[in-house]
Amino acid sequence: MNCFLHGAVGHHKDWANFINSIPDKNGFAPNLYKYVNYDLKRSARIINSQNPDAQTLIGYSMGGRIALHCLLEDNSNWKRAVIISAHTGLVSEKEQQIRIKKDNDWASNAINKWDTFISKWEKQSIFKNSHLIERNYSLYHQRANIALSFQNWSLGHQKFLEPYLDKIRIPILWIVGELDLKFLEIAGRACKILPNCDLIKFKSTGHRVPWDNPSLTAKAINSFIK
């Protein structure tokens, strides 16, 4: 089974069109908010344990960070993985503490000022070269879980993963948008460390690679999992 992990302020249904594009539709996207009461390590172990027929793990942004944690756990049975626009972590404790405070502020706004929260989220510079993700379903009822995801899965709580990436021996496809400069740099460093990594850079594409360039993303994933 091919497992798709959604991004922050995302929804498992965001992956529906990509799952439908897989031959035999052999894929699913779990609701990651079921795990927000746990830290990244524990969440990763649970996801691994719930996928005995593990084939391909696909993760975008926050889901990509969770995917990397899954691959580094000793109960991982994944055969291959696709990492899209993912961060490998902050190096210094100062950076981590700043990020934790920032994510706690996001969490507070998600609970208390939802409309303001969404507006500020979409106006971030990271999305300036990306499209909105079109949804016919609401994230509003997930706001408490979204807040918890900022608190428990903050990038500030994540250890810096680059020193551990050489332990991931399975094939990795790392996808990033050429306009997403910070994550382009992260992807380049990560793929130099990973023993079996192919890096694909999509032209004229920002952070939200799957939704900025859905046809190329689906083609890349399907070619990789064959």
What spans do the regions from the language model cover?
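Gly/Ala-rich beta-loop-alpha elbow adjacent to hydrolase catalytic centers
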Residues: 59-63, 67
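Catalytic histidine-centered segment of alpha/beta-hydrolase-like enzymes
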Residues: 205-214
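Short beta-strand/loop motif that positions the catalytic acidic residue
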Residues: 168, 174-176
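Conserved alpha/beta-hydrolase catalytic His-Asp/Glu region
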Residues: 93-97, 109-164
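Conserved acidic catalytic loop of the alpha/beta-hydrolase fold
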Residues: 41-55
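Conserved HGGG/HGGXW glycine-rich cap/lid loop of the alpha/beta-hydrolase fold
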Residues: 1-37
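Flexible "cap/lid" loop of the alpha/beta hydrolase fold
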Residues: 72, 78-109
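Conserved alpha/beta-hydrolase "acid-adjacent" motif
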Residues: 181-186
